[in-house]
Regions:
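A glycine-rich helix N-cap at a beta->alpha junction
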Residues: 8-19
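N-terminal catalytic cores of NTP/NDP-binding nucleotidyl/phosphoryl-transfer enzymes
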Residues: 1-2, 8
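Active-site cores that bind ATP or allylic diphosphates and position pyrophosphate for catalysis
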Residues: 17-184, 189-402
Length: 402
């Protein structure tokens, strides 16, 4: 569904990020840049920025890659004082880059888009890549803004509004899928944000019109995705608890070897865990100043997926992803596909079965690919069970062509 939405939004080609999407921003960026660089035909990388320029990202990236002695000294002092690593890193960077004014670095490094953008630049510098970075600065609402406004609402606000409509209206006024699919709602797939803003401003205060207004703004080809999202047919963190329970019941002796897990965290997990805990209860019990809740979620996901340091960590040092799996493409992208096949220095997979043939020798690549397929199958099985349908094997998944 995401591939369909990306293609309908104007993308020519959609490539899977594979299992590296479950890792931290550093590994996520390293894998993404590794794929793009090895395609052999990518000139530019664009990413979101709240307000910073490419030069700002480059300055931080160089500092964090080189780690001069003064930086390491301040970093250690701040860690010993009780600061978390992100706080200590921002303080040290601010002292070196802005003449002992850490507040500038703290402001920069607290933004999620800046953290990811910084890792993109670090990955480009580490690979000596010829790909040129380009920032797209945010317009409209801030990343964390939770209210719809006239121009460029945040994704957070849109998600919350979707929940609001479903909770208050959808059971009484279900979306008219037939009307939307017939094109009568006027959705052409263009300027969706403007339609949302206009309809929101004109009808939001009229409760009886609200569901119809939201339907008109977001129906058509987007409706199945929205309906599934609102009806909770997608996988949530809580859906993973039975798998964590099972892993713990096995009394796994190597829990400390899962990717992102350390011995201290493993001990806390074993001390806190008890049958009947919710996923959020577990996160709350594991919460510590030294690790973010997002990192905790990733670690627990890696336990569910049985992802250990090897081969994941070892492979990421050099070639983070040994293949690029194409999920979908537009009919007009044939020249791009041809250029990729001519220039790519990694395997190009268009059908999952191709990967099965390529990586059947027990190598690290084979293990990574099997984890990727297993992850997709697990997600599909949970989602299918919640939706009351039969799951589709990842090996039978077809490319999306638009």
């Amino acid at each position: 569904m995401r591939t369909q939405m990306a293609l309908s939004g104007g993308a020519d080609l959609v490539i899977e990020m594979a299992i590296y999407a479950t890792a931290s921003a550093e590994y996520f960026a390293t894998a993404g840049i590794g794929i793009l660089d090895q395609l052999g035909c990518v000139d530019y990388l664009s990413f979101g920025s709240e307000w910073a320029e490419v030069e700002d990202f480059s300055a931080y990236a160089t500092l964090f890659l080189e780690e001069p002695e003064k930086y390491k000294q301040i970093l250690q002092e701040q860690l010993k004082s009780g600061k978390s690593f992100p706080e200590a890193r921002a303080f040290a960077a601010g002292n070196l880059l802005f003449d002992s004014k850490p507040e500038k670095a703290i402001e920069f490094l607290k933004e999620p888009n800046h953290i990811l953008g910084l890792e993109y630049i670090k990955a480009l510098q580490r690979r000596n890549s010829f790909i040129r970075p380009v920032v797209i600065k945010r317009k409209g609402n801030h990343y964390h803004e939770n209210k719809l406004t006239e121009n460029y609402s945040s994704a957070t606000a849109i998600r919350q509004e979707m929940y609001h409509f479903y909770r208050n209206f959808s059971r009484k006024n279900p979306y008219n899928t037939e009307t939307c699919n017939s094109g009568k709602c006027g959705n052409t797939g263009k300027n969706t944000n403007n339609r949302v803003s206009n309809i929101y401003n004109n009808t939001y205060n009229k409760e009886k019109d609200a569901p119809q207004a939201f339907e008109k703004a977001l129906c058509g080809e987007y409706l199945p995705f929205i309906e599934g999202f609102l009806q909770n047919n997608f996988v949530t963190w809580e859906d993973l608890m039975p798998y964590l329970d099972y892993t713990f019941l096995l009394k796994n002796k190597v829990i400390g070897k899962y990717f992102g897990m350390n011995l201290d965290l493993a001990r806390r997990f074993q001390n806190i865990y008890e049958p009947g805990l919710s996923f959020e209860d577990l996160i709350e019990g594991l919460h510590a100043r030294q690790i973010t809740d997002a990192a905790l979620r990733r670690v627990l996901l890696h336990i569910v997926l049985h992802m250990k340091y090897y081969p994941f960590l070892e492979e990421a040092k050099d070639i983070p992803v040994p293949y690029a799996r194409i999920l979908g493409f537009s009919k007009s992208s044939s020249p791009l596909l041809k250029e990729i096949r001519q220039n790519a220095t990694l395997d190009i997979i268009q059908r999952p079965a191709e990967g099965k043939k390529l990586y059947s020798n027990g190598s690290a690549q084979a293990q990574i690919y099997s984890i990727d397929i297993r992850t997709a199958d697990l997600y599909e099985q949970i989602a299918a069970r919640k939706a009351g349908r039969k799951p589709i094997s990842e090996y039978k998944r077809q490319q999306v062509i638009r």
